Amino acid sequence: MQIFVTTPSENVFGLEVAADMAYEDLLAFVEMEASVPSKDIILSLNGNPIVDTDPKATIGSLGVTDNSMLLLTTKRVAPNPSTSAQPAIPTLDFSSIQIPGLPAAQRVDPRAEQIRTQILERADSLDQLKLSNPELAEHVHDSQKFSDAFTKLQNELRAKEVERKKELQRLYADPDNEDNQKRIMEIIRQENVEESYQNAMEHHPEMFIRTDMLYINCRINGHDVKAFVDTGAQMTILSEEFCEKVGLSHMLDVKFAGVARGVGSGKILGRVHSVPLQIGSSFFPASVSVIEGDQLQFILGLDMLKRFKANVNLRTNQLEIGEEKATFLGEKDLPDEFGKLGQEKEKKQDHGSAGDAFKDEDIVNLMSLGYSREKVVVALKQTDGDVELAASLLFSQ
């Protein structure tokens, strides 16, 4: 349920709580939100101060219900019960108070709305939010749902902070205990890691943006293909299936058959010594190794890149080779068989095996190159299920 607290400065903030929450935990939440020590807080419900109450009592037993409005005052300004000359706190009914312009069941947190507006004004902020909190990003176009998710997140953070403080209190009560010392060190380590993460997200959010791999448009023997530019691949590679598709199987020299060894091993069927490779309007004679299987199409390897003094120019987003400047393709231009990043890939993974979240067919195809299941799964995880990139990773390492 959601309750609202009014501060002495007439600010209102919402809290997502449960009826069985202890009163002392509610005070801890209010302390974090209002920056007032819990020992100085007095909460009033319907004008009646909640005082001399068992800290362990549930807020439901105290009469707090969904959409309750609590008034926050402090002991420094609260009436002194021992002084009869001071007037009593007037009895006010807050149960009927509503935030103007909004129905009781739908109140938007003004802080959440401010954050949502700022995010919508900056595309990079939305990208960062998608990485750090997908749930908030999902509701960024709906003010009410965003506010609800924001309130839920804030309350979860408060609850974690309350639990952390309680745990530290317990640990420091017996600092000589060896297990307590280990746990304290672990908490400190986690805090340092989290601080480093938050600093990186704040100052270098671009480091968390997924990077597109480098592909260019080209033609092999008159057939269009998206070439994966891989400076980590020693050889230029065609798959067996694609070799047949472009009509080069009859040119395969099986004397060069063998086994490619890297992290694992893959069967090389042979080599086609002269392949008409067209990039832009220029032709480049290429020698390609043909690999067993159908999970690869075409990888432009280091042998070709060095031979033609190619330059991977990330500043201009182009591959400069010979007189040509081929622009690297954006994610939206990649065909499905290359394992597009984002939504398309997630859909593929959703149909994968329950154990590894990858399709059994993809795992079997990669294992046919001579790699163990464990190494194949690791490669798929490293490439987010991208079969093309996983095969390249396994082969080129």
UniProtKB/Swiss-Prot annotation:
- What are the cysteine partners in each disulfide bond? none
PROSITE patterns for the chain: UBA, UBIQUITIN_2
The domain of life is: Eukaryota
Recorded hits in CDD domains, A to Z, give:
RP_DDI, UBA_scDdi1_like, Ubl_Ddi1_like
Pfam families documented for this protein = Asp_protease (PF09668), UBA (PF00627)
Which Gene Ontology molecular function entries are recorded, alphabetically?
Answer: aspartic-type endopeptidase activity; polyubiquitin modification-dependent protein binding; proteasome regulatory particle binding; protein-macromolecule adaptor activity; SNARE binding; ubiquitin binding
Entry's SMART domains?
Answer: UBA
Gene Ontology terms describing biological process: positive regulation of DNA replication; protein secretion; protein transport to vacuole involved in ubiquitin-dependent protein catabolic process via the multivesicular body sorting pathway
Q: Which GO terms describe its cellular component?
A: cytoplasm; plasma membrane
Q: Where does the UniProt annotation place the signal sequence?
A: none
User: Keywords assigned by UniProt?
Assistant: Aspartyl protease, Cytoplasm, Hydrolase, Protease, Protein transport, Transport
* Name of this protein: DNA damage-inducible protein 1
Q: Which InterPro entries match?
A: DDI1_N, Peptidase_A2_cat, Peptidase_aspartic_DDI1-type, Peptidase_aspartic_dom_sf, UBA, UBA-like_sf, Ubiquitin-like_dom, Ubiquitin-like_domsf
